[in-house]
Amino acid sequence: MDIYRLPALSDNYIFLLHDPNQNIGAVVDPAEVRPVIDKLESLGAELVTIFNTHHHFDHVGANKQLIQKFPQLKVYGGVEDRGRIPGQQVFLQEGDRVHFADRVGEVLFVPGHTIGHIAYYFPSVAFGETGELFCGDTLFAGGCGRLFEGTPAQMVDSLNKLRNLPDNTRIWCAHEYTLKNLQFAITVDKDNTDLQSRWAEVKTARGRNEATVPSMIGVEKRTNPFLRWEQPALQLAVQSQDPVQTFARLRGRKDRF
């Protein structure tokens, strides 16, 4: 399974999964139609699947146009998003399986950003290979999504679920937010040397207009404050030892940053 990162809108990423053996594609969170069509045409591939993580327009905006062009498309989304994802036919819950190419993905229910948010996790199939996580707006490189519909407790549970995936899991998050996320992270975890190194690397990469997605679970566990709510430095920064309250105060600071 090949994965292509397609920039869209101002800072979105669409992900096109390609099965070179059957020359078919699946798209994750198509915000715009043109980048998807252009990549499919360059591959000569047929689109067969849409995997949506949640209902926000910058993740489902191209659903209708893609269905018009590929009438046999199957559209997947979370069961809690029934009626909110255009063209949705398959309603997924925690633990359901999805199939593409030679990979079997697991559905993870990760409410917080929205109440119906799901993620798609494709475990590695061979020693030394990476797992692949398509997590929408739940976990970002260096950050996490705003809480538009869910609660801090829900988001902590969701992020903990993602944090427990293998360290060599690649994180295909849906926005290029890393620079600003790490700019905030430094303010609450300034003595973290791993974070300092990553901040320098990301500044250089973005200065060259290079993408910082995908990230890795192992990297996020060392540098992302929203996966480090038990760390004394972060608890001290927000004056709380309670995990949910620590997260909520960090998220509140980030919202105002």
Swiss-Prot record:
Thiolesterase that catalyzes the hydrolysis of S-D-lactoyl-glutathione to form glutathione and D-lactic acid. This is Hydroxyacylglutathione hydrolase. Pathway: Secondary metabolite metabolism; methylglyoxal degradation; (R)-lactate from methylglyoxal: step 2/2. The lineage of its organism: Bacteria, Bacillati, Cyanobacteriota, Cyanophyceae, Oscillatoriophycideae. Monomer. It comes from the Bacteria. Signal peptide: none annotated. Binds 2 Zn(2+) ions per subunit. Coiled coil: none annotated. It catalyses: an S-(2-hydroxyacyl)glutathione + H2O = a 2-hydroxy carboxylate + glutathione + H(+). One of its GO terms (molecular function) is hydroxyacylglutathione hydrolase activity. SMART domains: Lactamase_B. Zn(2+) 2 binds at D58, H59, D137, H175. Zn(2+) 1 binds at H54, H56, H113, D137. Its cofactor is Zn(2+). Belongs to the metallo-beta-lactamase superfamily. Glyoxalase II family. GO terms for biological process: methylglyoxal catabolic process to D-lactate via S-lactoyl-glutathione. It is an enzyme of class 3 (hydrolase). The keyword Aminoacyl-tRNA synthetase does not apply. Keywords: Hydrolase, Metal-binding, Zinc.
